């Protein structure tokens, strides 16, 4: 397998695309986002992060036959059996806003505020005529806090305080948050893999 020179990021979320591009900068890849290529995201109907990431990656790969990277992320609250998890974005959308989602989640928690963020990255590419699929998982633990605090980041970042910190992800400077959040953990694993390609 030779190193590939191009990569499609199967996401329309510009915040996510910028984060991924920054991590992959040392590899000098020509990176395009799904929206730049006018491609539509498929419905994510998997029951796990792995399934959803693969659904996105496989759909875009089938259209372009180029290396594709996709991810699925979620916010899980332990005492709510991992909810909202794989439906994190849809739950917030159904609530009308992330702030309202935070309020509803807070009303459902009594004493156990432990929470976690998870990202799974799927990479699909062709090697000597064979389609190769790789998965890279990143997780960080912490606590749900309400009301949310901070202006940086997006999604559930304002209501998540990583273990060992007294700031939410949204209160942290971008350069700090981007180095250790759940997506960064998964991206470092991806980068380690890319370095092994001859």
Which residue ranges define each predicted feature?
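Anionic-ligand binding patches
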Residues: 2-8, 15-198
């Amino acid at each position: 397998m030779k190193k590939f020179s191009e990569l499609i990021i199967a996401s329309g979320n510009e915040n996510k695309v910028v984060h991924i591009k920054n991590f992959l900068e040392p590899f000098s890849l020509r990176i395009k986002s799904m929206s730049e290529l006018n491609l539509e995201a498929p419905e994510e109907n998997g029951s796990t992060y792995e399934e959803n990431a693969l659904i996105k990656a496989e759909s875009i790969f089938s259209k372009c036959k180029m290396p594709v990277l996709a991810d699925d992320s979620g916010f899980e609250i332990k005492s709510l059996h991992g909810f909202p998890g794989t439906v994190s974005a849809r739950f917030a959308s159904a609530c009308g806003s992330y702030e309202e989602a935070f309020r509803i989640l807070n009303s459902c928690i009594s004493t156990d505020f432990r929470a976690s963020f998870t990202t799974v990255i799927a990479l699909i590419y062709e090697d000597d005529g064979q389609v190769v699929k790789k998965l890279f998982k990143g997780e960080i633990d912490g606590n749900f806090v309400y009301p949310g605090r901070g202006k940086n980041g997006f999604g559930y970042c304002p209501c998540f305080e990583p273990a060992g910190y007294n700031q939410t992800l949204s209160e942290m400077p971008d350069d700090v948050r981007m180095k250790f959040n759940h997506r960064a953990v998964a991206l470092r694993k991806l980068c380690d893999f890319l370095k092994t390609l001859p």
